[in-house]
Amino acid sequence: MRLHKRLKQNKSLLPSNSTILLAISGGQDSMALLKLIIDLKRLHQWQVEVWHGNHQWHAKSEETEDELKLWCLKNQISFHSNKADKKEVANEEKARDWRYKNLIMKAKFLSSKNIHFPCTRILTGHTATDRAETVIMNLARGTDLTGLTTLKEQRTIENNIDLTRPLLIFNRNETLEICKDFNLPIWIDPSNENINLTRNKIRKEILPILNSIYKGADSRIASVANRLESYNEDQKLFAKIAIQFCQGEKINSLSRIKLFGLTNSIRQIILSNWLKTMGVKRVTALQIEEINTKVSQRKPPGSIHLHGDFLIRWNKEAIYISNKTN
């Protein structure tokens, strides 16, 4: 089995003798994940817990939750759920934040209930196809290297809690085959059919065209993102050292004079990583290019507003960042 082989290669991905919390929507990817984990749970001595987020986005949301709960109980899997207030999930970004917030709270609760089987892993059903969609979306928006290496196999989201995506070695066609082979129920979310949403348009219209031209294009795009990930980690390490070298007199500043002596591409890498370390969550490659151009040598003092009420300003000697809400 492919997942079992991957777990043997990286034993820290899903440690044995622990509680793992699965985010299950009821769609084909998450149900395939649940089946694979159930089949391996005895071997790895896992306590498997299912969490379902009810966004109340469509008329059958309650029905989906009830039927999924019943299926889990029949298969002797613990089931947990939360219902969202409409304001909490007004858009995709808010909905994602709501899910992760509740998943983290549930993981902490499970750990407190069983200290011998702590819940240190939260699992989602993201596949190689999801990763390919994200790469295409970020490329179209304009991104730096970090934007091409999103949806990592594992990342820390809270102290002692990692978000893990075991299905990145599968594409969506393969998760559908798993569901068919094991006769798994699949609950369709109508919101996934709305092509007015960017990701759905890529999923329904763009990726199928790419796959028809180059069979398996989604898996290869995801593979490129995976290879770039290690390169990106090396770049982050370099940027950390470079930021220390360019540190200004104040903690929220960089020396503009030191930046002048570096190449254009290195300045952009430093600026991109510096902004992220200072708390700027969303910055595009075009914005980095604009900042880099405006703070270049012989350019007059000025300022730029960024997402999240952040303000970048500069004078002759330094570049500063501040949050307008503070």
Curated annotation (Swiss-Prot):
GO BP term, example: tRNA modification
An example molecular function term from Gene Ontology annotations: ATP binding
Enzymatic class: ligase
Record InterPro entries: Rossmann-like_a/b/a_fold, TilS/TtcA_N, tRNA_Ile_lys_synt, tRNA_Ile_lys_synt_N
Gene Ontology annotations for the cellular component aspect, listed alphabetically: cytoplasm
Signal peptide: none
EC number: 6.3.4.19
Subcellular location, principal: cytoplasm
Keywords: ATP-binding, Cytoplasm, Ligase, Nucleotide-binding, tRNA processing
Subcellular location per the Swiss-Prot or TrEMBL entry: Cytoplasm
Catalytic activity: cytidine(34) in tRNA(Ile2) + L-lysine + ATP = lysidine(34) in tRNA(Ile2) + AMP + diphosphate + H(+)
Domain-level remarks: The N-terminal region contains the highly conserved SGGXDS motif, predicted to be a P-loop motif involved in ATP binding.
Descriptive protein name: tRNA(Ile)-lysidine synthase
Protein's organism: Prochlorococcus marinus (strain NATL2A)
